[in-house]
């Protein structure tokens, strides 16, 4: 396996997240390389490092976002699933998970915080894009795809993961969700400048 670890940072990353990424790739049998984005918007922060990984010759891509928390063995579980595209669920806020399913249990979309994709499957789903959104009605049963109006551009966040997942869903190639969940990190208090005794960030982890 030739694994491209894609970290679509827009400028910052949690240090423990980096430690966990290194721990995970060292725990599996693969040749790996890290591809990062720096100070780039969504979706360019995804598409550009993925393109670099394609050029490098990656056979698999592990998308890992900069604020994630990874339990030991999560990458091995993604690989062992054998799915063309597999993802771990994680909370977007306390008590609210990322994965969305239809009434039959099929995955409409997951987040891109911990997602493993085979090269061919990823190429068929690219590029990530944010120029469409979905209007959800009928108590979550009906999803209508619409182009984001000019008046709303610049006022939205994300949606690349929803567009990505829904494209796979409509092709009857839904994302596989592994049993293990990941977590997210957030800053509770920023370090106080020029104070040794308060020179660190207080960071909390949110899990399922």
Give the role of each language-model region:
Residues 1-37:
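N-proximal low-complexity "stem/linker" segments adjacent to membrane-targeting elements
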Residues 26, 54-55, 79:
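Residue-level signal for alpha-helix termini/capping positions
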Residues 40-45, 157-158:
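A short, glycine-/small-residue-rich helix N-cap motif at loop->alpha-helix starts
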Residues 47-60:
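Active-site nucleotide-sugar/metal-binding loop of Leloir-type enzymes
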Residues 50, 71-146:
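Conserved catalytic core of nucleotide-sugar-dependent glycosyltransferases
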Residues 58-69:
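Short beta-strand-to-loop acidic/aromatic patch adjacent to the donor-nucleotide binding site
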Residues 129-208:
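C-terminal catalytic/acceptor-binding lobe
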């Amino acid at each position: 396996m030739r694994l491209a670890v894609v970290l679509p940072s827009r400028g910052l990353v949690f240090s423990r997240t980096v430690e966990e990424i290194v721990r995970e790739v060292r725990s599996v049998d693969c040749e790996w390389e890290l591809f990062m984005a720096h100070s780039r918007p969504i979706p360019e922060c995804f598409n550009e490092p993925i393109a670099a990984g394609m050029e490098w010759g990656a056979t698999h891509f592990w998308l890992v976002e900069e604020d994630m928390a990874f339990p030991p063995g999560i990458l091995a579980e993604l690989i062992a699933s054998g799915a063309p595209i597999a993802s771990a669920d994680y909370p977007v806020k306390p008590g609210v998970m990322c994965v969305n399913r239809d009434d039959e249990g099929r995955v409409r979309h997951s987040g891109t915080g911990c997602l493993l994709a085979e090269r061919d499957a990823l190429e068929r789903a690219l590029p990530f894009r944010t120029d469409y959104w979905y209007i959800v009605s009928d108590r979550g049963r009906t999803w209508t795809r619409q182009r984001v109006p000019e008046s709303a551009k610049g006022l939205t966040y994300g949606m690349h993961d929803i567009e990505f997942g829904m494209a796979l869903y409509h092709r009857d190639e839904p994302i596989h969700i592994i049993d293990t969940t990941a977590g997210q990190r957030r800053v509770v208090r920023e370090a106080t400048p020029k104070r040794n005794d308060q020179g660190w960030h207080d960071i909390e982890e949110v899990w399922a």
